């Protein structure tokens, strides 16, 4: 069966309308925890940075170390916990798509399936890490045979000794490193394009691994299931993404808003307020904007993809039965 966006959206709206527990309320709880944790971490980082800056001298070395350790541990804890919290929304979306009850305890499903979710995340990371390493090595070799490699070869030539080993003295020269960095831009572009050309198709083949693991599958099985159901269907999933272009664009703009103070500073724009106040205002504004966006639209987007997963899974079941 072909994935028809309009049909998925209409079915999704019906699923949300008949949900026993308000999907927007559930998304609000999910978003409040996610963004609230990010906001708290951001504010605590600012506080810790100020405390570290105000602690000088050898006498404050122990205090600075403790503050830096607390800052690192806090960031690590939130970074590790959020993926398990965020993936739980996929379980809620599956419940909406199937007419099942999704309520606040559903948002803990990612933690209940800790091992499987962790396995999916690690395997996904290994897939793209391996792909990145392969592209870096093979792509660099291929780049040397292109006409764009001439500038980089010329920039590297002065620092190569007769034995083909880099001269460490010249490597310390700022002028030489600036020339190499400038000449390496075509290589970076080439590798980025090559990586995107390989990674995007792979990403769309494992796009539904989160739904599969929330549907009860184990880590490797969930990835294989996603590969199986998206066979010859990745383009249709991509077209669904294109129909949600406005949602992803608004998400990007909210992220840009969070770093508005940094962007304005890079553009040379100075605000008539202190940098710390500017950081807090922009970061809080971005968090609020993102929260409103997710509260209003996240349920409709999530249930659309959940219904796409259900459709693809049903199609594979029919094919296997035949």
Q: Whereabouts are the PLM-identified features?
A:
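Interfacial aromatic "cap" segments that immediately flank transmembrane helices
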Residues: 2-37, 104-134, 181-192, 200-253, ...
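Short, small/hydrophobic-residue-rich motifs at membrane-helix boundaries and re-entrant hairpins
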Residues: 9-10, 21-98, 116, 125-132, ...
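Short, membrane-exposed interhelical loops at transmembrane-helix boundaries
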Residues: 224, 228, 268-282
């Amino acid at each position: 069966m072909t994935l028809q966006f309009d049909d998925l959206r209409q079915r999704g709206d019906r699923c949300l309308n008949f949900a026993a527990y308000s999907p927007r309320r559930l998304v609000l709880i999910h978003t409040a925890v996610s963004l609230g944790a990010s906001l708290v971490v951001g504010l605590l980082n600012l506080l810790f940075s100020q405390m570290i800056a105000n602690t000088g001298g050898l006498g404050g070395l122990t205090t600075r170390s403790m503050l830096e350790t607390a800052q690192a541990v806090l960031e690590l804890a939130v970074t590790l916990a959020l993926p398990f919290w965020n993936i739980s929304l996929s379980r809620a979306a599956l419940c909406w798509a199937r007419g099942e009850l999704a309520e606040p305890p559903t948002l803990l499903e990612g933690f209940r399936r800790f091992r499987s979710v962790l396995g999916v995340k690690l395997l996904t990371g290994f897939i793209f890490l391996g792909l990145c390493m392969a592209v870096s090595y093979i792509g660099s070799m291929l780049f040397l045979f292109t006409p764009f490699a001439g500038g980089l070869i010329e920039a590297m030539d002065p620092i190569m000794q007769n034995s083909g080993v880099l001269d460490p003295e010249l490597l310390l020269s700022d002028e030489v490193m600036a020339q190499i960095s400038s000449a390496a831009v075509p290589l970076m572009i080439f590798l980025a394009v090559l990586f995107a050309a390989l990674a995007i198709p792979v990403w769309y083949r494992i796009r539904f691994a989160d739904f599969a693991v929330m549907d009860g599958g184990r880590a490797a099985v969930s990835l294989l299931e996603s590969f199986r159901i998206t066979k010859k269907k990745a383009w249709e999933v991509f077209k669904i993404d294109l129909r949600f272009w406005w949602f992803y664009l608004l998400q990007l703009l909210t992220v840009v808003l969070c770093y508005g103070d940094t962007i304005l500073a890079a553009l040379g724009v100075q605000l008539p307020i202190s940098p710390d106040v500017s950081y807090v205002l922009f970061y809080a504004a971005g968090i609020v904007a993102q929260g409103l966006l997710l509260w209003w639209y996240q349920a409709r987007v999530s249930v659309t993809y959940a219904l796409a997963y259900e459709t693809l899974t049903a199609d594979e079941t029919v094919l296997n039965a035949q």
